[in-house]
Amino acid sequence: YSAAPDMDQLISTDTMVEGVHFSFQYMMPYDVGHRLMTANLSDIAAMGGTPKQIVLSVAAPPHIDTKILDEIYKGIKAQCQRYKLNILGGDTVRTEGPMVWTVTIIGEVPKGTAVMRSGAQVGDVVGVTNYVGYAATGLGALSYNLEGYDMTKIGHQRPDPQIELGDQLRQLG
């Protein structure tokens, strides 16, 4: 894959480790796939780009029920369909440790317009596009089995990437 001549290519990789980034005690397998994709999609959105393709890898222990893997994949695939991403391939390996999922995402942005942290300068205005601590509050509510906090729980389990907003902010400069 290569970007069109008038586009720059973007790439990002995110990894989620069972017991560190997710737990089946408070997340359904489908939600794990959704959240993994949102992390990657958000990286492209933060650069003001459009996601195009992914490469997916999983390291799974031999005792894992393949139905769990299938459900995680369904969460990944649903996000890919929603954002019209191609799954180029990947790898599946066995591990004696916890389950590990890695996605490398490829996107594109009009040439010379990518928003990069390295472009930040003293005096720039820095903003956030969602509630600070929202997903962490949801994680706490899930971990301690607290009643209520429904929106923050959803914010942790099924966050939404801000693809359109990232593009709009890039256009504003």
Per-range role (PLM):
Residues 1-173:
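Helix-biased detector of long, well-ordered alpha-helical tracts
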